[in-house]
Design a protein with these regions (language model features):
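Alpha-helical solenoid scaffolds in eukaryotic macromolecular assemblies
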Residues: 1-75
Length: 75
């Protein structure tokens, strides 16, 4: 079955096709990723840090998502 994608995410993806540096569009995708399991969110984080490789803020979001899942399963 096809996976449901919220309309706001579709619009954000379209904006990024036109301008891959659109921070408003990235913010929508980041918020969506933060509400997903890491195995689904990882692709978004990978794209984010590939687009902004020198952004410590974005790397921190990615690392925190990975560490949070590690901590969750450690208990």
């Amino acid at each position: 079955a096809a996976e449901y994608v919220p309309e706001k995410v579709k619009k954000a993806e379209k904006k990024l096709e036109d301008n891959p540096y659109d921070l408003d569009a990235w913010s929508i995708l980041i918020r969506e990723a933060q509400n997903q399991p890491i195995d689904k969110a990882r692709k978004t984080y990978e794209r984010l840090v590939a687009q902004f490789p020198s952004s410590g803020r974005f790397w921190k979001l990615y690392v925190e998502a990975e560490v949070n899942i590690f901590i969750f399963f450690s208990y």
